[in-house]
Amino acid sequence: LHLQTPPTDLTEWKELISRIATRSKTCTIALVGKYVKLHDAYLSVMESLYHAGFENESKVNIKWVDSEHLVDQNCCAEELGDADGIIVPGGFGDRGIEGMIQAAQYARENHVPYFGICLGMQIMVMEYARNVLGYADANSSEFTPEGHHNVIDLMPDQQGVETKGGTMRLGKYPCTITPGTKMAECYGTLNIDERHRHRYEFNNEFRAEFEEKGLVIAGTSPDGRLVEAVEIPGRDFHLGAQFHPEFKSRPNRAHPLFKGFIAAALKYQSEHTPTDHPMSLGE
């Protein structure tokens, strides 16, 4: 066809390769999940952490932690004590949930940067309800359908739907970010679009109580009805997102939340020598 094609501009990729080759820092991120024996189950999250490391001039070591092993805070200290940040990705079903809640509590009480994605955000909310609001039985209706304090509940348009896969809130949806939040700082804008895959959401019946006890609603649907993200103020990074930011991260364009999370992990590391990391009560 004798088409004239312009020369390929590889400048951006050459700069990326240069950044990767000259990384001078290293941080350790504990990935707490139920499918950790098969790392590919979290491939997008894993790659997104690496992308964020590139932009922060850091290597990222991922420590794979089976949430079923985290039976109490002493176990958390043993498994998570050398981590510079803790991430809890998405998932379904009640297996390993209590261990994830233990991990979220450990992160909150020890000021370790925490990033909760989808289920990980719901875990963050349940932990806060149990240990800050005082609802010891706080849970999700996914796990305790008849629970009295289900701070995570089935979305209204999912009521009565029995099949999971084809009926979720799927795909890209807009989100309005609350000004002055860590989330706003990471994105640099107040209006974003992110990809979703869930049936359960933050239960607005408890929203006022959470806000009174200090939890910040960092992002909502444009009409304010759906809570899309929450965070604890005054922390370098303790944030949960109902959406899946890992689906939009790229090697040459790390997702803003992953970038902010790794930056916070590096800051935490710089402020804590190995002997300063939280230890178990027995040590």
Please state what every model-predicted region is.
Residues 1-236, 245-283:
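N-terminal beta1-alpha1 cap of cysteine-dependent amidohydrolase-like domains
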Residues 242:
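Active-site ExK catalytic segment of metal-dependent nucleases
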